[in-house]
């Protein structure tokens, strides 16, 4: 008989995030009342964060295979073949709730967790990126959260030794009570030496590796599956504490152990800690698992079985080991100064059995913990399709130059230098394009190849039209990779939404998934990994739908990359793609015209046009016929032009030939467009090649000087533009330091 001295009450069930019908399902599965430890295990395995019970139905509709895909969703990270016997392993994951409660530690451990997902599979991490969403700048907590999150990411990544080379930062009132911290990591491995979490073999030792177990992070996964209320500050003890130096030791020890041939299966201890890692390893291999918690290294006295099973202490791994190499494995971990303990074994009875002080504290059917988790087909309401906005209905500014300067200094448009200068983006010595461009690029050691990385989503588009917003997030990633000369390979998604029990929120989720799927199929851009973060609500108010997309591309030769910077004076500037002046959901409409409650349609995404235009631009880059390339997104043509000018320190003169209102031409956010420069004597041939391919190509102007001039009007000094662009974020953060 399993001892159970805690009465399981409806209140206790609710505290564990379980619904009454879910608890009844537990009773039906095990035929008795669970112990407290067993209740905690079910709570961890059946919460939204671990089971994907609200999203699984829709995630299955995404395309996940392709000629280069070695491993798609279901493992710690996705694996994609990059040729020459090498693979890139990558994933993006959220750490939203912890980062709001304790910004520094929440963000730091988000980085640590995603790095473990990558090196658990045998890869050495080579790049990190992050997508950050904060509340309104005038909200009293925003500065504190920005400061803590950025310091946490920088402190962990810099100490661990991985370059943080790109990302996104946005501000919006919908994130006032729920910031988003989405961390991306990628690593390189030999394609034939990938390590998986599926346990194989009966009676094999299960080994605990890494840091000791403490009480930090207990119920972290459960917290990530619920919305916040007034008392969210009280959840601080559920935030994990990270140590990047221990993680670096764990990385080196794991890679050395993998090279020894001792590892049969490996899983990092992330959400739900020892519970989730042990269950996943056993269930995937159709094996049972027996653990003796007396053998788990602990850093705190008197820990109960419940606490040990649900702790989310960081920098820990679980491994199934070849018994013949047990001593060799232990020697490696002793060498690196890390805890190594055999805490259990695999069994053939498909039970998940936990012992503490000689007593059985849990004895559950291991497959049911995952396979029998509830799966919901939640009701959803399709959003009303918004109407396109007539650009002539949007007021024109008196002075376009002044508006450009204003736009470049907006919180959502200003330089992120204050953020990325706190990250070491050059460590490892392989960064070819760092933060500030369309995509970051690193050199791949052992050859000429390069890898490109980008993160993108436009939440205001997703709120207005989820399907178009989902398509646009993928398409912009595809454009950003293309703009540096990379072949887009695959994506990872990080789907951040509000409460899925609300049909309108579930409708947003479904629409975005449909749009992501549309784009991935049309662009041959499979989804190989991802994460879902739901219940991003505070006091019933949800965030904007934010399906962040991380993408990876391949350059055959990293020397062929291009950047957004103008390279020389006197070069031709050519616009690729059609401009229709779409101002619906634009930065201009929201922040300049003041239409913050705009209900118009975002710019539509024509995926066939995206592919055609992008393939042409990439071919021109690879042929060496371009000197600078920039995709056009937030803010439109004029903002993209200013960004190219600032990056190169060279001005430009442009004369658009358009029947559109000038502000719609300048600030419209039509998709599938690029600005491209080339030597003057090659411009006619470039345009002729584009026209032959059926692609709109328009000569806009010429680079030169230290000003931007539109239609021969009053020139705008680059110095003034740059001051506005670079000034807002440092001034905003400095103002907080003075308070």
UniProtKB/Swiss-Prot annotation:
Q: According to its UniProt record, what is one Pfam family this protein matches? A: FGAR-AT_linker
- Which UniProt keyword terms apply here? ATP-binding, Cytoplasm, Ligase, Magnesium, Metal-binding, Nucleotide-binding, Purine biosynthesis
| Top EC class, one word | ligase
**A Gene Ontology term for the protein's cellular component:** cytoplasm
Which residues does the annotation say bind Mg(2+) 1?
93, 531
Give the binding site residues for ATP.
52, 91, 493, 530
Q: In which pathway does it act?
A: Purine metabolism; IMP biosynthesis via de novo pathway; 5-amino-1-(5-phospho-D-ribosyl)imidazole from N(2)-formyl-N(1)-(5-phospho-D-ribosyl)glycinamide: step 1/2
Where is it located?
Answer: Cytoplasm
Q: Which residues does the annotation say bind substrate?
A: 94-97, 116, 240, 312-314, 533
| The protein's assembly and partners | Monomer. Part of the FGAM synthase complex composed of 1 PurL, 1 PurQ and 2 PurS subunits.
Q: By what name is this protein known?
A: Phosphoribosylformylglycinamidine synthase subunit PurL
Q: Source species, please?
A: Parvibaculum lavamentivorans (strain DS-1 / DSM 13023 / NCIMB 13966)
